[in-house]
Amino acid sequence: MAALVAAAALAAAEPPPAVPAAAGSGGPTSRRDFYWLRSFLAGSIAGCCAKTTVAPLDRVKVLLQAHNHHYKHLGVLSPLRAVPQKEGYLGLYKGNGAMMIRIFPYGAIQFMAFEHYKTFITTKLGVSGHVHRLMAGSMAGKMSMTAVICTYPLDVVRVRLAFQVKGEHTYSGIIHAFKTIYAKEGGFLGFYRGLMPTILGMAPYASVSFFTFGTLKSVGLSYAPTLLGRPSSDNPNVLVLKTHINLLCGGVARAIAQTISYPFDVTRRRMQLGAVLPEFEKCLTMRETMKYVYGHHGIRRGLYRGLSLNYIRCIPSQAVAF
């Protein structure tokens, strides 16, 4: 889902035009390569900062979604105080290391997809300028599934580490988690538990978030163009949302989309935890997991457990990324 944000950023980016190189310089190709390397690193670092900022909320959400027995009796925000008391403040960042590692290959796949599609659109379809950047960004967004599949094992490891509580560690670190899951849970297949609800949850999330953001933008610029809009830097005759309004609309769109797709997120997390949970044998498939969660915990405290944390994290994560 973060890939949708990455695709939008890619679509908005445009490398500087190639200029004749002076004698002894690296030439236009090397300059363009450096530009994309710089953009990739900047995007990855921004992603790391954004994820680290909301890491405590992510860790608490995992504990609540899977009803960790140490914290299941607490409300949504109480674990933010209980975790530091029991595990120290670093306990709020368990699993964040695996997330940081995941961001770089995830971003690399997005950038490679964008470049591949941009070249294809330019050479095969003859489209250039803003149109081909938007088309390439859209197609790169569709490649998010590839990025998810390639980096999914790191997400599984991240969730396993985040669910552990001090004094009851099953895994001593990232490498040990990889080795243990591979050895005890069916080899590579053990790293892809929960992939189906992940993929199924991406479709409603993407469609609802884009539709909601587009609607908010259209309505806002139609009824309050002076208050909410500003002239585009590319074309002064075109109005775009002001930065803080764009941020707010993006946060609202994400919150609505996450509400609709959240049961898939709960299902994914519980399946990713696999043998760590005592009900593992009863939740081998997506259908079994959803049925178990609904039957034992209902809708509010089961399929939507921890949703309010998603609302809280929408704005700060977007703000830091910007």
From Swiss-Prot:
It is found in: Mitochondrion inner membrane. One of its GO terms (cellular component) is mitochondrial inner membrane. Its main location: mitochondrion. Disulfide bonds: none annotated. It is a multi-pass membrane protein. Keywords: Membrane, Mitochondrion, Mitochondrion inner membrane, Repeat, Transmembrane, Transport. One of its GO terms (biological process) is mitochondrial coenzyme A transmembrane transport. Solcar repeats lie at residues 34-120, 128-219, 241-322. PROSITE patterns: SOLCAR. InterPro entries: GDC-like (IPR002167), Mit_carrier (IPR002067), Mitochondrial_sb/sol_carrier (IPR018108), Mt_carrier_dom_sf (IPR023395). GO terms for molecular function: coenzyme A transmembrane transporter activity. Belongs to the mitochondrial carrier (TC 2.A.29) family. May be involved in the transport of coenzyme A in the mitochondrial matrix. Very little is known about the physiological function of this carrier. This is Solute carrier family 25 member 16. It comes from Rattus norvegicus (Rat).
